[in-house]
Amino acid sequence: MLEASLHDGSTIEIEVHGAGPTLLLPVNPQPITGPQAEAMRQWGADPALGYSLIQGLSDAFRVVAFDYEGQCLRLPKPETLTPANVASDLLAVAAAVGADRFAYYGYSWLALIGLQLAIRTDLLSALIMGGFPPLNGPYAAMLRVTTAAHEMAVEAAQTDKAVSEQQPAVEAGDWSNVQITVSPDQARQFVTLYQALQGFDDRAAQEHITCPRLCFAGSEDEIQYGPKWGDVLVSIAGPIRAGHTELKSLGWEVRVLDGLDHLQAMQAEQVVPILRSWLASQIRS
């Protein structure tokens, strides 16, 4: 098993599947099973998403899979999950597999860190951002959401009542009633990330992206949080639709997936055809 050393001194396991142009995928390569898998299905998520992406891409690409989000949850980085450090971590993964050129695909906050990588290296052969706009990104809204999550995690940690006992059943994609199941340190690291991005000018950053790039989102990707979250709206599709013309002028290929929300647009049946066709037209072995 290959490993890479990350900025905090921890190591992350890496799986490599297939041959061809290298594609970094920050996903869990192993299907999740048991109660956690059932909870994910009820929420509308796929517990085998990473596995499905690998299966759908590894016949055409050298897929480098590593569970970066899972590693951050297992070994939180409450003070050090900064844009520069996450970019350094991604480069460490590429170095560990001997990739001097590679494409990167990430979804949601893992797309965001791909953008941070792209402006810090010339090693990218292509960048695909799903579920997060590369222009006019919701950085302020996400700071409010992650701050609220941290506050609720601290409150839960200070009570005797188990987190699992506090959770009513939720419907798939019901962001207004989403429950906090993470520790204060797990939540704090994302506050650190979005705090560091409050001064980030994603329009000015565009000139530093030198590789082919594509962004996509579901047309219904508008995440409305409830009162305990400050009634925050995290708009993903809005900036992509409104900025479609400008994004294309800046070199982006833009896809809006009709009728899909944040969870639906990340599923393998949506993502694999996009990545296969577009990457095949942009990069060669």
Language-model segments: residues:
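A short loop-to-beta-strand scaffold at the N-terminal edge of the catalytic core in hydrolase folds
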Residues: H7-H17
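Short beta-strand element of the alpha/beta-hydrolase
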Residues: P21-P35
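Conserved alpha/beta-hydrolase
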Residues: G44-L73
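Conserved acidic catalytic loop of the alpha/beta-hydrolase fold
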Residues: A84-F102
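Flexible "cap/lid" loop of the alpha/beta hydrolase fold
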Residues: L112-I119, L123, L127-E155
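Active-site nucleophile elbow and catalytic-triad environment of alpha/beta-hydrolase enzymes
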Residues: P134, A187-A205, A237-A242
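Short beta-strand/loop motif that positions the catalytic acidic residue
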Residues: I209, C215-A217
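Catalytic active-site module of serine/aspartate enzymes centered on a nucleophile-bearing elbow/loop
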Residues: R241, K248-S285
